[in-house]
């Protein structure tokens, strides 16, 4: 699904949830700047999952990464380490690298996760794992119960991967292919 289509559909979800015009929803705006509060974010999340047939992660990418890396590697005393900055810049391609110079408070990171374009990229990444067609007969797939989709023709069912599972996979890949080689080079130097 093209990013522009995802943006348009997500803008409609946000506009409907916040009772605003869709034109007010721009890529760089934060949902809180549009008036979203915690209950609105829950409603937006649920509607996004329903309309896109995806399951958003419950934890932030940083929380997931701390589970893989362990404590103290990505953040210390409430601030990102250099490795934490590298990981987030890699995961948030729209983030301005200048915002990650100097001391970066973990608490201040929330604004990136509330930006519309961050949501759109996250949705795009999850939609990539939602099959449109059945692997058995190439007929369209339709949402079923819970984390499942069902073929409209042959009835074959699949279980969708959760956003949590996909985040863990991405972090593990980053850890194995980017962090470990970098950390090993630093130790041997």
Regions found by a protein language model. Give the residues of each.
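Phosphopantetheine-dependent thiolation modules in NRPS/PKS and related acyl-activating systems
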Residues: 1-45, 50-189
């Amino acid at each position: 699904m093209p990013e522009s289509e995802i943006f348009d559909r997500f803008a409609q979800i946000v506009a409907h949830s916040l009772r605003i015009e869709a034109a007010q929803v721009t890529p760089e705006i934060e949902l809180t700047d549009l008036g979203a509060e915690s209950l609105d974010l829950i409603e937006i999340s649920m509607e996004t999952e329903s309309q896109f047939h995806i399951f958003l992660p419950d934890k932030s990418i940083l929380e997931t990464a701390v589970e893989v890396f362990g404590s103290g590697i990505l953040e210390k005393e409430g601030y990102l380490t250099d490795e934490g900055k590298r990981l987030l810049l890699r995961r948030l391609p729209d983030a301005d690298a200048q915002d990650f110079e100097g001391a970066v408070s973990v608490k201040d990171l929330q604004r990136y996760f509330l930006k519309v374009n961050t949501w759109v990229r996250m949705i795009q990444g999850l939609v990539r794992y939602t099959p449109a067609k059945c692997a058995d007969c190439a007929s369209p797939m339709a949402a079923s119960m819970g984390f499942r989709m069902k073929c409209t023709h042959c009835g074959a069912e699949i279980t969708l991967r959760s956003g949590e599972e996909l985040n863990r996979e991405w972090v593990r890949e980053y850890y194995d292919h980017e962090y470990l080689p970098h950390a090993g080079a630093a130790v041997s130097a």
